[in-house]
């Protein structure tokens, strides 16, 4: 049954009218902007013909600088120079402080607990900093294209959660941009390679940027890009390589940076050494009157644990996709950190084939985003290309007994809408709380709560008579909205899930692993909970029936017998013996069968009293 008709946003009213649109790779280290010109996706350079815009903003006393000019201030004024803001967006202050305690900035909490960075120009949120970077990219694009943009596609890591995605959209809107879609970075890369190389089959997209890592397993067939599975780590990237080299320098020289400026200078030297080692066998580093040499072999040893960590994530993604490594026909390398020879070597060994690097790994994401932007803005209305991303964790709802009913399973392609009908538990129930959950476990306590809302105005009916339709909808940006509607009155309530901060990828992985490790125990716990819910339902209905008709239809002995069996079920329900509860339910059913028959007869007699046969035959 079709629940939702998806229409692409921003379709041009006139097919012949060309509209200006760009793809933006909002990266941790660098950002890029691209557009389709004369049928080809190209990077738009700045005034100095530079393609990469460092994702850095400097808030000086008198002026604000973005890009390379800001990056040059990093070692001179680190407290007012914000770098790698992508790591901070959509996170809580406590999360930022625990994860990134080495950052030179001073943080304060906003009213809703999100981090604000204290600068010479006042407190700045990660959304505002990202907005300044996007404004710079917008300026470059409009200067190059000679007009105002109709829309943009912005890429995000596949593992960005709702809060991080929504924060990215908020930053774009603050910059005055019309967001056509947020697109997963690996999907954008696959789009670029799919068009240029015409490849079909299973493809792995290994994306190692400055601050994030993503792996996506995709199936490309006849213009359809389907993401079979994703995995990632929002705290793994080339920045971590730099910090490992910096730690090695400290160990070799026995000197520790004493100031934030020295720390930033050390990181810069480490980054330069990493770049040198991409093409050379060794690199010489001069630090505070000391000169040390690091070989490529030493560098490989330093980064081995991080590269291995990324490959373990690849293994999990293959398992999720139900794909063997030998089935992967091509491996696409994305992100500047994939230039490191050891990374390419290890990825090649893992998948058993040489990775594809024909498109600049720094540019491939932006180029793919530009292609999608050109389609969405209406310049390619004849395109039959379809992009299918997936939800990384199952989305469900709490039911009676603290159970989780999954509405949208993990790895379902998006956009998607799924609906399911629920009913009331008690007679006369006029409201229902919808508790939205995320995770793979069977019980509410073991899953992540995303939000709650209450549907009011349900007509009072007997338990089980009301029909409440709950619809879960995940849009193309991965944002979730939930609607509950009572079918007879059409009264409804809804919520858009917008958490204040999100899960780390380690937590996502742990949640998935936990569901496997506890599968048997979870199933037993679910069966016990379901039996308790059924016992509660039976107990409730018998108590109501006894109160209404027990004195009239039952003898004293019959009444006491039912009460005794009822009490036995209430006692056994408190235990954890599922079979004993089932036997108690059966015993109560047997004890009340005659009572139920008498109630039915009494109800029929009452309905027929005072009516003729003709009234019944011709109502």
UniProtKB/Swiss-Prot annotation:
- Please list which residues make up the signal peptide: none
Presence of the UniProt keyword Nucleotide-binding in the record: yes
By its UniProt entry, which InterPro entries does this protein fall under? ATPase_NBD (IPR043129), Heat_shock_70_CS (IPR018181), HscA_NBD (IPR042039), HSP70_C_sf (IPR029048), HSP70_peptide-bd_sf (IPR029047), Hsp_70_fam (IPR013126), ISC_FeS_clus_asmbl_HscA (IPR010236)
Per UniProt, the keywords (alphabetical) are: ATP-binding, Chaperone, Nucleotide-binding
**What GO molecular functions are on record for this protein?**
ATP binding; ATP hydrolysis activity; ATP-dependent protein folding chaperone; unfolded protein binding
Which biological process, per GO, is one annotated for this protein? iron-sulfur cluster assembly
Q: Give the protein's function.
A: Chaperone involved in the maturation of iron-sulfur cluster-containing proteins. Has a low intrinsic ATPase activity which is markedly stimulated by HscB.
What does the similarity note say? Belongs to the heat shock protein 70 family.
Q: What is this protein called?
A: Chaperone protein HscA homolog
Name the encoding gene, please. Answer: hscA
């Amino acid at each position: 049954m079709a629940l939702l008709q998806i229409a692409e946003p921003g379709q041009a009213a006139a097919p012949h009218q060309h509209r200006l649109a760009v793809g933006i790779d909002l990266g941790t280290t660098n950002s890029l902007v691209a557009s389709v010109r004369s049928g080809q996706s190209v990077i738009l350079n700045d005034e100095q013909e530079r393609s990469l815009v460092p994702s850095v903003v400097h808030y000086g006393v008198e002026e604000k600088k973005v890009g390379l000019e800001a990056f040059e201030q990093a070692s001179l004024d680190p407290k007012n120079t914000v770098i790698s803001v992508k790591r901070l967006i959509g996170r809580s202050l406590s999360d930022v402080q625990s994860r990134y305690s080495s950052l030179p900035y001073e943080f304060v909490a906003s009213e809703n607990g999100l981090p604000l960075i204290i600068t010479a120009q006042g407190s700045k949120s990660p959304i505002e900093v990202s907005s300044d970077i996007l404004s710079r990219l917008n300026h470059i694009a409009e200067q190059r294209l000679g007009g105002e943009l109709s829309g943009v596609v912005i890429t995000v890591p596949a593992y960005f959660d709702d809060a991080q995605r929504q924060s990215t959209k908020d930053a774009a809107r603050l910059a005055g941009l019309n967001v056509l879609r947020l697109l997963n970075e690996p999907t954008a890369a696959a789009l670029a390679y799919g068009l240029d190389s015409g490849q079909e089959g299973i493809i792995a997209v290994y994306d190692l940027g400055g601050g994030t890592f993503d792996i996506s397993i995709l199936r490309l067939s006849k213009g359809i890009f389907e993401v079979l599975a994703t995995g990632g780590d929002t705290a793994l990237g080339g920045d971590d390589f730099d910090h490992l080299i910096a730690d090695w320098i400290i160990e070799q020289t026995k000197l520790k940076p004493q100031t934030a400026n020295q720390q930033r200078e050390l990181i810069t030297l480490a980054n330069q050494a990493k770049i040198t080692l991409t093409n050379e066998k060794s690199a010489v580093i001069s630090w505070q009157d000391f000169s040390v040499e690091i070989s490529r072999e030493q560098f490989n040893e330093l980064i081995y644990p991080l590269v291995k960590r990324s490959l373990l994530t690849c293994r999990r993604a293959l398992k999720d996709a139900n794909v063997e490594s030998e089935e992967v026909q091509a491996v696409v390398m994305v992100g500047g950190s994939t230039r490191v020879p050891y990374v390419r070597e290890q990825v090649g060994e893992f998948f058993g084939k040489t990775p594809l690097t024909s498109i600049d790994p720094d540019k491939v994401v932006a180029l793919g985003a530009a292609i999608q932007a050109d389609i969405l803005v209406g310049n390619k209305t004849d395109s039959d290309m379809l992009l299918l991303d997936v939800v990384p964790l199952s989305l469900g709802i709490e039911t009676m007994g603290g159970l989780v009913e999954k509405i949208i399973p993990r790895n379902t392609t998006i956009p998607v809408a799924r609906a399911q009908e629920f009913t009331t538990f008690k007679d006369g129930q006029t409201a229902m709380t919808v508790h939205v959950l995320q995770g793979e476990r069977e019980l509410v306590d073991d899953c992540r709560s995303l939000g709650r809302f209450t549907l009011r105005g349900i007509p009072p009916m007997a338990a089980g008579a009301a029909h409440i339709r709950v619809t879960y909808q995940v849009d193309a940006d991965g944002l979730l909205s939930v609607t509950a509607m009572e079918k007879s009155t059409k009264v409804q309530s809804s919520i858009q899930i917008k958490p204040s901060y999100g899960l780390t990828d380690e937590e996502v992985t742990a949640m998935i692993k936990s569901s496997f490790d506890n599968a048997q125990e979870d199933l037993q716990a679910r069966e016990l909970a379901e039996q308790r819910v059924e016992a509660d339902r039976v107990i409730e209905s018998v108590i109501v029936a006894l109160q209404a008709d027990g004195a009239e239809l039952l003898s004293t002995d019959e009444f006491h017998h039912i009460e005794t069996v009822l009490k036995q079920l209430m006692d056994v329900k408190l235990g954890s013996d599922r079979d004993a509860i089932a036997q108690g339910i059966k015993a109560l059913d047997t004890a009340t069968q005659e009572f139920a028959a008498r109630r039915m007869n009494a109800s029929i007699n009452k309905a027929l009293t005072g009516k003729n046969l003709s009234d019944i035959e011709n109502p």
